[in-house]
Amino acid sequence: MPEAPERHVFVYGTLRRGGRNDINRLSPAPDYVGMGEVRGVLYHLDWYPGLALGGEEAVTVVGEVYRISAELEAILDGIEQIVPGADSEYFKREVEIAVQGRPVTCLLYEINPVHVRERRPMGHGDWIVFHHG
């Protein structure tokens, strides 16, 4: 049976190390690849953030990149409440993330723009520093 293709995920909020939903506490365990960066806008939604890619107010958003299994990807989809259609709070995207100067194709959970229309951007690219600062 062929091996499943390698998957990576970029986590920028509560799934980061030390966060409320720390990915390292999930099973099957992910493999840490390194710190990553992407341009976008972070929004403080309550006890968690939402990231919109690009935009006029984009900053460098930092996060962690992990190699994950298909089983863990399904668990993450549940945590992020991914549902078919336009009503999902997050959309799962595949994007290029800069990891130590090299591009890595990663899954990223991007906030549905409907959920941030009336929100102000954080103006900061590191949720952990913002949240614990």
Q: Residue locations for each model-derived region?
A:
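Glycine-aromatic micro-motifs
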Residues: 1-133
